[in-house]
């Protein structure tokens, strides 16, 4: 039975606890914790007992964090078979990676059921010791899910070598034990899967495997041969050679991916099963220290599942090989019924690949909210559970902290408490400011996979809903003052974090979003002053505020994340898009309408907006305009027409259309890589060809229920037309005839 217990005693007169003692939050949430009434003060030194046989990585943690001497508080450490912990055998959970921890004023005991358990017991001890004093405590603990962690499987800029090393330290502290290396943009994982890594990259892989092992993380190297593999002896030999080369680098866990492939032969279950069984026999079973294979199938979600592929794979594939699964769709949370459905078909427990908080399909958003939606009853039904993170490694830790909580102790998982603890853990010096930032970066916005997250901008939502609901945006001094204060918090929080020297790796990643958050706050404060100007009948102030807000909006649109040479994706950050951005749009429209009703206005300042700014699909004859060769650094290619919606990289078919206030024309940008259309309909921009609003912006006309896109007069006044391959610019005489 799982216990979360506090023992409370009635104190006699004259006896009291140390005023500074406390009950400490432990992460992940342990299976059983018993706090006593006795206060414990962090010792200056400790005396090790059992250090001759205990796990070396656990001992190194102890020695790195404590002074060791023969006169210190006794700390007994070891694994189940060690003589040092024999007196405590009955207390050690008989579970893989389990541990028993006792902290008292007489002795500290860290007793693991195995080496990982000892290591995790020390990690819990170190969390406690971050406090100078706390109540004495006994912990009996083990994980619900034996394989839990992260799969680096997103499309975009892969994590750096330093990112990965920092991740392993984080995983060790939070008891995550799996990292699957599968970055889509590593050619030696994908295109060059047959070739060995060059020497410099091989050294990096070896270091990753070593550092992961020190943190009790299984470094799983994934191979993605599905694009072009042949089911022949030559490719079988190439596969063995590649795996052997990785083994020599220290890798002891392997995965093979057949996801997101389109070759008919490569997608067949029988070919995949025979190939993987060969690798299991000829490689895994011939190395005593290699873990069972993990494979990602071609039909990795229910929405793509046919009638025969999964049952055939489950029947023919060696039962020791794990099969990955993303749920009902590519991006989905996992429930109990999902597990019953898939486990029955593959004749084993599915290995969950959770596509959250990955944001490669909504790259302008950071997903910093609570991690929720997965059932808390599936622990016994999963063979493993890994999260696909964002390309922003440090920002991903908000969610990964909760993934660790969830997979360790599923029934007691509290998404909101875990979220709060994650923010405090990652940004303890600026928790309140960081919380404000996270609150405004929760939802994904409209996206091709349909996943949305509730709870963004919660305080503002209350006031905005009241302003719009009761008054239809009409002037209300009290509500506008309340809204104004919330945007003051937004600006102040952004300033606090932008000026901080704490957690530089995290702040560097989120800096573009912090800048956007501040600008949004400043823009809304100008909108509120525009309300006041209309109320005061001050036309000049209204126009001045509006023009100032346009300048801030243009500055906001110019902020780019990952804007470095070679970057694969360069998003313009979106912040508070669920509540605040629509509020800004509606309020600007409302205020301009009121202004026009009362004053003679200039059309150069207040142009007519034919199409509201936002993300759009561009369709013609039932086909979707697609950025097929998305690459932020590619030049000279054209978008093409596709008959099907892109369900793997939906942003290839999403186009960000925005009006430039200074010209009254529209800019058209692809959401996948941030490249914009030029006057000829191509992606011809490069680092040496900057955006030119006289050449690269468009007039948009609505005629006969359709839209026409026309280049500027400087670019020839051409209209975009469609042919079989894509779009091209032609003379714009006779718009009606061309539509």
Task: Indicate where each model-derived feature is located.
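Acidic, His- and aromatic-enriched active-site or binding-groove loops in soluble protein domains
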Residues: 200, 204-205, 242-251, 273-275, ...
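Feature activates predominantly on carbohydrate-active enzymes
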Residues: 89, 93-235, 248-252, 285
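Acidic, contiguous N-terminal accessory segments
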Residues: 19-105, 131-139
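Lectin-like carbohydrate-binding module/patch detector with strong preference for beta-trefoil
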Residues: 602-739
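Substrate-binding groove of N-acetylhexosamine-processing glycoside hydrolases
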Residues: 26-29, 34-35, 278-304, 310-605
